Amino acid sequence: MRHKVAGYKLKRDTAGRNSLLRNLATSVIEAERIVTTVTKAKAVRPLVEHMITLAKTDTLHSRRQAAAVLRTPESVKKLFDTLGTRFGQRNGGYTRIVKLGPRKGDGAEQAMIELVGSELVKRAADRAKRREERLKAQREGRDHEEETDE
């Protein structure tokens, strides 16, 4: 019976499992969205949630705790500068797991783990970029029309 047995083994020894989870957590924080297996996504979710909770209290101690888990200094910087402020008023539930179906090669069930709200940030950035391109095209079109009129 599995009473009070928490966590996932992921067919690895302790060091390999910890390394995998640290790498996944770093990737989620840097990219804000990754595709992996459902089990790995469920295993890394508590770690990512804890890192964001640390980022909400921006102290030297919390930065050092996050740096002990995350692999790159850039991910720690992004965590505290961007994500900590973004999720400042939110009490948990910072990640979302979306199932994607089986992987073609081995049939493993795939899932996307993403930070809640990252799709809004990316959508707004894409919208601004498209608007700039449209305005630029309109300006070039006017410039071209003025040249042909002369």
Swiss-Prot record:
Signal peptide: none annotated. PANTHER family: LARGE RIBOSOMAL SUBUNIT PROTEIN BL17M (PTHR14413:SF16), RIBOSOMAL PROTEIN L17 (PTHR14413). Pfam families: Ribosomal_L17 (PF01196). Part of the 50S ribosomal subunit. Contacts protein L32. PROSITE patterns: RIBOSOMAL_L17. One of its GO terms (molecular function) is structural constituent of ribosome. One of its GO terms (biological process) is translation. InterPro entries: Ribosomal_bL17 (IPR000456), Ribosomal_bL17_CS (IPR047859), Ribosomal_bL17_sf (IPR036373). GO terms for cellular component: cytosolic large ribosomal subunit. It comes from Solibacter usitatus (strain Ellin6076). It comes from the Bacteria. Keywords: Ribonucleoprotein, Ribosomal protein. The gene is rplQ. NCBIfam families: L17 (TIGR00059). Belongs to the bacterial ribosomal protein bL17 family. This is Large ribosomal subunit protein bL17. Residues 126-150 are annotated as: Disordered.
